[in-house]
């Protein structure tokens, strides 16, 4: 699981300028299960090449807080959302399992 401030997938005007290069690089490594980021306060989610790309909703400029806790299981990742952030279950592809 990787963490970064900027999103790279799905396509969005908040993404890193070289988002395609980074998603291509990450796809080469079967151990990568998820890429978690912020920056886009609206949040976002996509899956590409068996990797979950999760943008956590922002907690500034809103009346309601937003954050999440990720639980890691052998076959899935579970985001327990709080405030504006909704829960999400992300099944791990065979490529990311030990």
What are the residue ranges of the model-derived segments?
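His/acidic metal-ligating clusters that form di-metal
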Residues: 1-52
């Amino acid at each position: 699981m990787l963490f970064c401030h900027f999103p790279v997938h799905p396509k969005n005007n908040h993404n890193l300028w070289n988002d395609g290069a980074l998603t291509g690089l990450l796809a080469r490594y079967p151990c990568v299960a998820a890429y978690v980021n912020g920056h886009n306060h609206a949040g976002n989610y996509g899956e590409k090449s068996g990797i979950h790309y999760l943008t956590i909703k922002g907690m500034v400029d809103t009346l309601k807080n937003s954050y999440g806790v990720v639980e890691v299981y052998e076959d899935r990742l579970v985001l327990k959302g709080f405030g504006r952030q909704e829960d999400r279950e992300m099944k791990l592809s065979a490529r990311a399992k030990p």
